[in-house]
Every structure is written in structure tokens, then in C-alpha cells.
Regions:
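Alpha/beta-hydrolase active-site loop
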Residues: 162-181
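Short beta-strand/loop motif that positions the catalytic acidic residue
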Residues: 292-294, 298
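Bacterial Sec-dependent N-terminal signal peptides
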Residues: 16-70
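C-terminal catalytic histidine-bearing segment of alpha/beta-hydrolase fold enzymes
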Residues: 303-310, 314-390
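Short beta-strand element of the alpha/beta-hydrolase
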Residues: 117-127
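Primarily recognizes the serine-hydrolase "nucleophile elbow" in alpha/beta-hydrolase
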Residues: 179-255
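N-terminal cap/lid segment of alpha/beta-hydrolase-fold proteins
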Residues: 61-115
Length: 390
């Protein structure tokens, strides 16, 4: 099983190295991340970009001398000067000193003015082939304006973070948020997840394993929940999930990327099944609203993976099916989409979480939708787009 894991991880690394384009939607700047780990710290206050979660220009954090007493009681929290937002940085959800087990949290109120209100929360999981990436890079959505809190997490990466370690970390982050929900004004009954690429796959694992501690997949026992952190009595259940171009079937993924013989030996098949999100559909009795967003010209994780997840989910939950959507980005690659497409997705994603975490059922949804993307800005993506339009 370990040998096949190495094959899968090598496959993912090759995929990640093939296309490292910047994106208006998802920022996966590998060079910046490498610089951050060289210094062994994240200089979050030096970022001059817009505050992508709140939609406000990034403002200076007020000094500790003028923080309210309420904020002092919380871990690493400060007010933004020009918004009704509290940000809590570098919180370790695993009770360790590992920076790969930390989260940042934005709350849509000033702590001393929140009264007893609790907010739904969306947790973002970054991509990077389980080999790199950072919680500092996340989609540019205006969740706070819709009174939805937002968190972005790190998780352990390979070689330390092999499957299912990163799943255990993500579940620990959810349990930490639920265990501290009253303190941080979070609604523990309305937690959403979203992620791209590797983070999209991890989002799918979470969506398909609600309330499951362990499973047998092709005669192999898989520890789903893990025992990371102090909040083991809390639930890691989520209520809604969005998967951006995460893979469905590890075997198909590696066969496509490395030319592997699809007729793997029996031992390898066990491993590929265990690391395939599609293997977990139907295992939980508590399916959640699930959205898939995938580009038709994705050469890293082909569009076929999004369709496989959509079809398997549809077939499995014929009765009492939760909300299910497949958003197809025609001509779209592995992210790196044009501004018009990105702006449309902002509305789609915000509406999805408002509808399912705030129970606003008046907001309509479409089970399938196609957005035609313009040619991407980078040369390789533009060539793909041009080929598709011939």
C-alpha cells in the first residue's frame, strides 16, 4: 500500500509541476509559498492585496494596547479598523506547534459587539497536490458581507501528510471550530467546506464521510476520523460542500498523467480505491448539499472526474437526494479563469452557501449549468481555449 501511495503522490507532484499559472480566482503562487517556508513564518500583515473575504481593502490591524477586553480573551484576534470584522490568525487547531496545523478565522462582527449572535462558517482548503500550498491563498468571495464567517486552514503535506493524515487534520479543524463555536460566535450547526484541486478532493472526502469513524474499502481498513487535537468528542460533520476540480478516481488520475497500466495489481487497487473520493459516495447516511465546479479543458484533473462524481452521487441518492450541482466551465482549465467567469462563480458560490447554511430556500439553484469561459490570460491556457473553439 505504501508503494502505491508513492506512485499516487508522484503522479500528483508531476501534475502540479506541469502548470503553475497564477489565477484571478485561486492564487496558488508556489514561489511565495516557498519563500514563506524558508523563513518558517507567514508574514500575513504585509500582504497588500484586497481582503478577499470581506471585499474591503486590507487595513492595518489595531495595536494590542487598544484591543477590547473581549478580544484579549480570544486567541490571536484583532479588529479591522475600517470594517465590522474580527480576524483571528495562526490558531493551532491540533494543540501542537506545527504551523501546518493552523487556521485563520474571519468573523463578521467586532467581538465586543457580537452579542449572542452566531454565524455560519465556510472553511476553505487550499490546493497544491498535497505537496505545497498555504491557507494565505483563498478564493475571492464576499462571505462576510452575507454574514457568513470564513476560515482558511493549513494541513500537513507530504511526506509527513500522506493519506489519510490530511483528512484527519481537516476533521480536527472542523472539530476545533465546533468546540469553540460559542466563544468565536460560530453556528456549530452550519459549517460549509470548499476547496480547489487537492483541496477539492479533501472537500469531497469530508462531504462523503459525515459521522463515519472508519470504513472498509476493498478489504482495507481506513481510519476516517483520526485522533488529532483535543476536541475528539465534537462532531466533524459538515452541512454543505463545494469541490473545485478535485479528482474523483485516483487510478484514472494517475493513469492519465503517468501512462500507468490501468490493470493495476490487487495490492495497488486497494490503495487507489482508498484514496479515491468516489469510493466514499454512499457510505454516509447523512449526504450534504454538494457542488462540483470543473473546466472542460482541465489537463491536470480532467473534466471526466467532475462528471464521475456528479453521476455517482445522482445514482446513489435517488431518494431524498440533497442539493447537487455540476457547474461546467466551458473552455476552462485547472482554475486560471477569466474575470467574467470568476465573477459569475462568486455569485453562484455565495448563493449556494446562503441557501444551505442560512436556509434561504428562496434563492433558486440549477442542477447543471455551463459557463462559457473566455480564453485565459496565460499562453498554455489560451492555446487550449483556442483549440477548443476551432
Amino acid at each position: 500500500m505504501k508503494a502505491t501511495l508513492l506512485i499516487l503522490l508522484t503522479c500528483i507532484l508531476i501534475s502540479c509541476s506541469e502548470e503553475q499559472e497564477s489565477s484571478d480566482l485561486i492564487d496558488t503562487d508556489l514561489n511565495n509559498y516557498k519563500e514563506s517556508i524558508k523563513t518558517n513564518e507567514y508574514d500575513q500583515d504585509s500582504n497588500d492585496e484586497d481582503d478577499s473575504v470581506s471585499g474591503n481593502k486590507n487595513t492595518n490591524i489595531i495595536s494590542s494596547s487598544v484591543k477590547t477586553d473581549a478580544i484579549k480573551e480570544l486567541q490571536n484576534c484583532s479588529d479591522f479598523n475600517d470594517s465590522i470584522t474580527t480576524v483571528c490568525k495562526e490558531i493551532n487547531y491540533a494543540s501542537t506547534d506545527n504551523t501546518r496545523q493552523t487556521l485563520n478565522l474571519w468573523i463578521p462582527c467586532k467581538i465586543n459587539e457580537c452579542s449572542n449572535k452566531q454565524y455560519p462558517v465556510v472553511i476553505h482548503i487550499h490546493g497544491g497536490g498535497f505537496a505545497f500550498g498555504s491557507k494565505l491563498k483563498f478564493p475571492k468571495y464576499n462571505f462576510l458581507k452575507n454574514e457568513i464567517a470564513f476560515a482558511s486552514i493549513n494541513y500537513r503535506l507530504i511526506p509527513q501528510g500522506q493519506f489519510p493524515v490530511y483528512l484527519h487534520d481537516a476533521k480536527a479543524a472542523i472539530r476545533w471550530i465546533r468546540g469553540n463555536s460559542s466563544k468565536y460566535h460560530i453556528d456549530p450547526n452550519n459549517i460549509g467546506i470548499m476547496g480547489e484541486s487537492a483541496g477539492g478532493a479533501l472537500t469531497s472526502y469530508l462531504a462523503f464521510t459525515n459521522e463515519i469513524k472508519e470504513l472498509i474499502i476493498d478489504d482495507t481498513k481506513v481510519n476516517i476520523e483520526g485522533n488529532v487535537g483535543k476536541y475528539l468528542n465534537e462532531s466533524s460533520k459538515i452541512q454543505a460542500a463545494i469541490n473545485y476540480f478535485g479528482h474523483a478516481d485516483s487510478k484514472k488520475f494517475c493513469s492519465a498523467k503517468m501512462g500507468l497500466d490501468p490493470n493495476c495489481n490487487e495490492k495497488s487497487t486497494f490503495c487507489f480505491a482508498c484514496t479515491s473520493p468516489i469510493s466514499y459516495i454512499g457510505k454516509s447516511s447523512s449526504p450534504v448539499p454538494y457542488m462540483i465546479i470543473h473546466g472542460t479543458n482541465d489537463t491536470l484533473v480532467p473534466y471526466e472526474h467532475g462528471k464521475l462524481l456528479f453521476e455517482k452521487f445522482s445514482e446513489t441518492y435517488l431518494k431524498n437526494q440533497p442539493e447537487l450541482s455540476l457547474i461546467t466551465i466551458q473552455n476552462g482549465g485547472h482554475g486560471n479563469w477569466d474575470d467574467n467567469t470568476s465573477n459569475k462563480l462568486k455569485d453562484i458560490n455565495t448563493n449556494f452557501f446562503v441557501r444551505n447554511l442560512k436556509n434561504d430556500k428562496e434563492i433558486p439553484y440549477e442542477k447543471t449549468k455551463t459557463i462559457i469561459s473566455e480564453c485565459a490570460k496565460t499562453k498554455s491556457s489560451a492555446n487550449l481555449c483556442n483549440e477548443a473553439m476551432k
